[in-house]
Design a protein with these regions (language model features):
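Short periplasmic/luminal acceptor-recognition loop of GT-C membrane glycosyltransferases, typified by
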Residues: 189-201, 278-285
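Generic domain-boundary/flexible-linker signal
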Residues: 15, 201, 225-227
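ER/secretory pathway lumenal C-terminal domains and tails of membrane proteins involved
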Residues: 20-186, 206-403
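Bacterial Sec-dependent N-terminal signal peptides
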Residues: 1-24
Length: 403
C-alpha cells in the first residue's frame, strides 16, 4: 500500500511539473489548444519573466499565451484596454521600451489609444530591431504585415525569403502552394482568404523567384488603402473608391462580402487578367457562383462556360507534383491543417478519376486513385473515434469513381 501511494505521488508530481513547463506558443493555425492550456502557459511564462525581466523570448510567449486565452474566452470584452492582454502590453512598455518584442506584440494587439501602433508604425520598428535568432513564425508575421501596409517595401521580399529559409511552413504545405502557383496562367490574379493561405505562395515567389508574374491578393488586404493603392499601380489601373457606409446600410452584417466582391470584380474587369481563387472563396464572398469553375486545386473566374475538366486533368497529369502524398513514410506533422489538406485533395480531385477512365487513360485514373487513397488512409488513422464511418464514406467516394 505504501509503495502504491509513493508511486501515485511521484506520478502526480511528474504530471504537475509537465503541466507547468513553459512551451513555445505557436500560431493556432499551426497548433491550437484549449483556453485552459493557454492560461497555464501564461502562468509558466510569467514565472520566466519574473526571473529575468529582460528576457524578450519569455515576454513574447507570455503575451501570446495571454492574448490567445483572452481571444478564445471573450476576455477582451467591450473594452480591450482593460484586458489582461492590455496589461501585458503596459508592463512591456514599462520594462522593455523600444524593444523588438514590444513592437512585435503591438502588431498583434494594441491599445485603442495607441494611434502609432494602429497605423502600423511598430511593424517598421520590429523589423529594425529584428534579432538574428528570431523564430520563423514571427518573421513570417512581420513579412505579412509589411506586405499589407507597404507592399512595395524591399523588406517584404527579404522577410519572406528569411521565413522560407527557416522553414516555418511544413514541406507539404509548400508543395501544395507550389502546385497551385504553377497551374495559374501567365500574369494571373490569385485571391485567397488571408495571409495564412497566401504567405507560402509569396515565399515561393520571393525566395525561389518562381512565378513572380502572378499577383497574389489576400482578400482581407482589400480593406487597406495603402495595399489597394499599390495593387492598382501594379495592375496599371485607376484606383477604386467605394463608400463602405453604403454597404453597411444595404447589406447589414454581410456588407464585407459584397464590398470585397465588388472590388474583386473591378480588378478583374479593369486589369483583364486571368483570375483564380482559393477553393473556399464561394463561402466568403458574394461572387457569382455560376462564373467560377474548378480547375483542380484552384477555382477560376470565367464569364463564359468552358471545359474546365480538361484543364483540371491536364494539371493533375502534367503540372501538379502529387507523388509525395502517396509516400508510405509521410506522416502528419503537428499542424492543425494536416488533415484538412489531405481532404482538400480528395474532395477536389476525386471526380477526375472517372474522367480519366472515360478518356481511356487508365494509368492516370489508377495513379490518382492510389494517391487519394493514401490521403484517406492518413486522415482516418488520425481520427480513431470516427474511423469506420469516415473510412467507409471516403472509400465509397473513391471507389465510385472507378465504376
Amino acid at each position: 500500500m505504501r509503495k502504491t501511494i509513493v508511486m501515485m505521488l511521484t506520478l502526480v508530481c511528474n504530471l504537475t511539473v509537465r503541466a507547468q513547463q513553459a512551451e513555445t506558443i505557436e500560431s493556432f493555425i499551426a497548433n491550437s489548444h484549449e483556453p485552459e492550456w493557454y492560461a497555464a502557459q501564461a502562468e509558466a511564462w510569467q514565472k520566466r519573466v519574473n526571473e529575468n525581466p529582460q528576457d524578450q523570448w519569455a515576454w513574447r510567449n507570455l503575451f501570446r499565451a495571454t492574448c490567445y486565452h483572452d481571444q478564445f474566452t471573450g476576455g477582451w470584452g467591450e473594452n480591450q484596454d482593460e484586458s489582461r492582454t492590455a496589461d501585458i502590453i503596459r508592463k512591456m512598455e514599462a520594462t522593455l521600451p523600444n524593444s523588438y518584442v514590444l513592437n512585435l506584440s503591438k502588431g498583434r494587439f494594441c491599445l485603442t489609444t495607441d494611434s502609432a501602433a494602429r497605423r502600423g508604425d511598430n511593424i517598421y520598428k520590429a523589423i529594425e530591431y529584428l534579432p538574428e535568432d528570431a523564430c520563423a513564425e514571427d518573421i513570417n508575421y512581420l513579412a505579412c504585415r509589411l506586405w499589407c501596409i507597404d507592399p512595395d517595401n524591399k523588406d517584404v521580399g527579404n522577410l519572406f525569403s528569411g521565413a522560407y529559409k527557416k522553414r516555418w511552413f511544413p514541406a507539404r504545405i509548400m508543395q501544395f502552394s507550389r502546385n497551385m502557383l504553377l497551374s495559374l496562367q501567365s500574369g494571373a490574379l490569385y485571391f485567397a482568404n488571408g495571409d495564412a493561405v497566401t504567405a507560402p505562395m509569396k515565399m515561393i515567389q520571393e525566395a525561389l523567384k518562381e512565378r513572380q508574374d502572378v499577383t497574389i491578393i489576400p482578400i482581407s488586404y482589400l480593406h487597406v488603402e495603402s495595399f489597394m493603392k499599390a495593387l492598382c499601380k501594379r495592375l496599371n489601373i485607376d484606383p477604386l473608391s467605394l463608400n463602405v457606409q453604403n454597404y453597411g446600410d444595404k447589406y447589414g452584417e454581410d456588407w464585407y462580402k459584397h464590398y470585397e466582391s465588388d472590388i474583386i470584380m473591378y480588378l478583374i474587369k479593369e486589369s483583364k487578367r486571368p483570375t483564380y481563387f482559393s477553393t473556399d472563396i464561394l463561402s466568403l464572398t458574394a461572387l457569382d457562383k455560376d462564373s467560377i469553375y474548378n480547375e483542380g486545386l484552384v477555382l477560376k473566374y470565367s464569364p463564359k462556360p468552358y471545359n474546365n475538366f480538361d484543364v483540371a486533368m491536364h494539371n493533375v497529369k502534367e503540372v501538379y507534383s502529387l507523388e509525395y502524398l502517396a509516400e508510405p513514410d509521410l506522416v502528419y506533422d503537428s499542424w492543425e491543417t494536416s488533415e484538412m489538406l489531405d481532404m482538400n485533395h480528395v474532395t477536389l480531385l476525386a471526380n477526375l478519376i472517372s474522367k480519366f477512365r472515360k478518356n481511356g487513360d487508365a494509368f492516370q485514373a489508377e495513379r490518382l486513385y492510389r494517391i487519394l487513397s493514401k490521403c484517406v488512409e492518413r486522415c482516418v488513422s488520425k481520427n480513431p473515434k470516427e474511423t469506420e464511418k469516415r473510412k467507409a464514406y471516403y472509400e465509397n467516394l473513391l471507389k465510385g469513381q472507378l465504376q
